[in-house]
Amino acid sequence: MGSAGLIEIKRRIKSVESTRKITNAMGLVATSKLRKTRKELFINKKFFEETEKIIEKLASTISQDDDSIYFKSNKSKYKLYILVSSDTGLCGSYNNTVVSYLDSLVRDEKENIKVITVGSKGLSYVKRIGLDTIADYVDIPDIPTVKEVKIVFESALKMYKDGEVSEINIVYLDFVSPVKQEPKAEKLLPIERITSVPEEFITEPNSEEVLNNALNIHLKGKFRNILLSAKCSEQSSRMTAMNGATQNANDILDNLNLKYNRIRQQIITQEISEIVGGAEAQK
């Protein structure tokens, strides 16, 4: 391989260097987004935990016979699953992991399952496991606001109130740490009865109405918490994937540079040999 080979290797080096710049930049962006989303998750989690304490206190004052829709299931044979996926790719096995987990949960009862996807990537993945979606929500921001939460939650809640589904479950990739994310399913409705010692306190207008209003706020907070956790997992997966791609690019560049220098050395050695050979021939 002569100078033509060197030109080809230089072209490949330039191409890999361009790719490395892109993957490195995307990795840095994912790291920055993860930091911001984790901060928001921490704040929202505190809010969620405080509302949960209030719910427990209020629920202890309500009769077990209370027919609130939040506690009482209906007779529908259908269950609703909200699948949280990503809107963009390049995040490793993130979407495949969460969809595979959904498949493991509903494999034996797919005819009784209704699915809502959050994130554009979920739609195609869900079809691969033989499920259709009844609604799809896309372009969810990196830090979901109350607006996005309200749209999805109220759509699902209406189906539950109308008796179309007997359960609302959310399947997502739970954020544990930047290097660990676990697929998880959370049942949003119906809520299990909380058994605790009743506390005596005054509520206006009445405990039932206050509890229902508080539950609505609490469930939206829980849903937002789940979306934020899923977004953290997405950015972690993307950060890991891009860092891995950047490292692979570095390894390829090392091999190409080594190959380039070896060929260049061979060419120089050959040229020196030809010069020496020519000089010897003229003696």
UniProtKB/Swiss-Prot annotation:
GO cellular component, one term: plasma membrane
Localization annotation: Cell membrane
GO biological process, one term: proton motive force-driven plasma membrane ATP synthesis
Gene3D superfamilies: 3.40.1380.10, ATP synthase, gamma subunit, helix hairpin domain
Topology versus the membrane: Peripheral membrane protein
Molecular-function GO terms, alphabetical: ATP binding; proton-transporting ATP synthase activity, rotational mechanism
InterPro entries per record: ATP_synth_F1_ATPase_gsu, ATP_synth_F1_gsu, ATP_synth_F1_gsu_CS
Keywords on record: ATP synthesis, Cell membrane, CF(1), Hydrogen ion transport, Ion transport, Membrane, Transport
Domain of life: Bacteria
Family: Belongs to the ATPase gamma chain family.
PANTHER family: ATP SYNTHASE GAMMA CHAIN, ATP SYNTHASE SUBUNIT GAMMA, MITOCHONDRIAL
Function: Produces ATP from ADP in the presence of a proton gradient across the membrane. The gamma chain is believed to be important in regulating ATPase activity and the flow of protons through the CF(0) complex.
Quaternary structure and interacting proteins, as annotated: F-type ATPases have 2 components, CF(1) - the catalytic core - and CF(0) - the membrane proton channel. CF(1) has five subunits: alpha(3), beta(3), gamma(1), delta(1), epsilon(1). CF(0) has three main subunits: a, b and c.
Name the record gives this protein: ATP synthase gamma chain
Lineage of the species this protein comes from: Bacteria, Bacillati, Bacillota, Clostridia, Eubacteriales
